[in-house]
């Protein structure tokens, strides 16, 4: 006997089919992730992609910050003629482009990036808090410094999350160079104070590029690219 399409049995089958289609549709929309302790984490590749993108933004803004500060103060105060002081994180170097860098483990590179970001957490906070004391400081310089501080803090948390994932949850206390430049930023001598800011902003731009390079090297190694 042929059943009518309006027969209750047919309606039940149709409802089941629609329900199954909707179920699969919802499953397809749920992003894939790694589940640990009942929580959903982004994949390692996704986390690295975000970290690299954020590090590029920070490097770009750090260069803009230095350029604007240089244009406003360096020429008139002859800051460019002074000898730059060593950056407080200069000891945290990346492996040089050679066979050694190829053999460097991604975790080692991530730890260098983490130490650099940690070592600049206090200096960036001091920079943001003390920049307003400079005479005729441009609002763009202040806003860029604040953005760099906020994004660097976010990137540090991201790098730590990547390290936790790669080390299966294992964490360890990290030692990084301390910052002792606050007194120079608050010097009563205007020229000395300006040079302290100038040197610090230059160092910050240099070290953000290190972080960017380290993260790109990690991404390259994880992706098994040949030109790392």
From Swiss-Prot:
Q: Which GO terms describe its cellular component?
A: extracellular space
Q: Which InterPro entries match?
A: 4_helix_cytokine-like_core, Somatotropin/Prolactin
Residues in the signal sequence: 1-29
UniProt KW Protein biosynthesis keyword: no
Q: Write the record's keywords in alphabetical order, separated by commas.
A: Disulfide bond, Hormone, Secreted, Signal
Superkingdom of this entry's organism? Eukaryota
Any one GO BP annotation for this protein: cell surface receptor signaling pathway
Q: Which cysteines are joined by disulfide bonds?
A: 87-203, 220-228
Q: In which tissues is it expressed?
A: Expressed specifically in the placenta. Highly expressed in invasive trophoblast cells lining the central placental vessel.
Q: Which CDD domains match?
A: prolactin_like
Spell out the subcellular localization from the entry: Secreted
Q: Cite a single GO MF annotation.
A: prolactin receptor binding
Q: What is its main location?
A: secreted
Which family would the database say this protein is a member of?
Belongs to the somatotropin/prolactin family.
Question: What name goes with this protein?
Answer: Prolactin-2A1
Source species, please?
Rattus norvegicus (Rat)
């Amino acid at each position: 006997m042929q059943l009518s399409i309006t027969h209750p049995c047919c309606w039940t089958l149709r409802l089941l089919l629609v329900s199954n289609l909707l179920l699969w549709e919802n499953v397809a929309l749920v992003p894939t992730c790694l589940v640990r302790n009942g929580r959903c984490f982004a994949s390692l590749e996704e986390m690295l992609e975000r970290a690299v993108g954020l590090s590029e933004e920070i490097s770009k803004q750090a260069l803009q910050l230095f350029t604007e500060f240089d244009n406003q103060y360096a020429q008139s105060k002859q800051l460019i003629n002074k000898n730059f002081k060593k950056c407080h994180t200069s000891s945290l170097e990346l492996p040089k482009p050679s066979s050694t860098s190829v053999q460097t483990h991604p975790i080692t590179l991530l730890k260098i990036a983490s130490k650099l970001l940690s070592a600049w957490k206090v200096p960036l906070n001091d920079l943001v808090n003390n920049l307003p004391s400079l005479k005729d400081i441009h609002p763009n310089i202040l806003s860029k410094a604040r953005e760099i501080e906020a994004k660097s803090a976010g990137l540090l948390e991201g790098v730590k999350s990547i390290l936790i994932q790669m080390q299966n949850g294992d964490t360890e206390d990290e030692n990084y160079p301390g910052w002792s430049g606050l007194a120079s930023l608050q010097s009563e001598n205007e020229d000395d104070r300006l040079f302290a800011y100038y040197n610090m902003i230059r160092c910050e731009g240099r070290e953000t590029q290190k972080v960017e390079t380290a993260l790109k090297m990690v991404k390259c190694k994880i992706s098994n690219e040949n030109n790392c």
